Amino acid sequence: MSTPKGKNDQALIAIVDDDQSFREALGNLLRLIGFRTAIFASARNFLDSPQFPNVSCAILDVSMPRMDGLELQRHLVATHPIPIIFITDLRDAKTREQAVGAGAISFLNKPVSEKTLIGALNSALSA
């Protein structure tokens, strides 16, 4: 199993995805490779969480009810800038351009390999 560069046990990674099985599997994987995680079923749950101010990086889905990932990204950029990685089923270029244009570190498609994910996290945490 790969490990993150300069394994950072202090980094808190937020996973915001309405797909319960995906967010739990991703949370388990990240904990196995040395990250602390906090998982949320919605953007609102994330923003209302007491853990929110301590998050080092957010992994977001694009398609979520009520507030989607792009809306959450805009909110974070305006109020609490942290590195953002999108992991999504969406494969359209316009959405990718919007996310990256607004500052996302990476825009990855599900399923994502562990190696690709670790590379994105290393980039995000060194940004």
Locations of the language-model features?
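Receiver (REC) domain active-site loop signature in two-component systems and cognate sites
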Residues: 64
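Conserved Asp/Asn-Gly motif in the active-site loop of CheY-like receiver
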Residues: 40-44
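Non-catalytic signal-transmission and effector/linker regions of two-component phosphorelay proteins
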Residues: 1-14, 20-22, 27, 115-127
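Active-site residues of response regulator receiver
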Residues: 61, 88
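A Lys-centered signature of the CheY-like receiver
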Residues: 110
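Active-site beta3 strand of CheY-like receiver
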Residues: 53-59
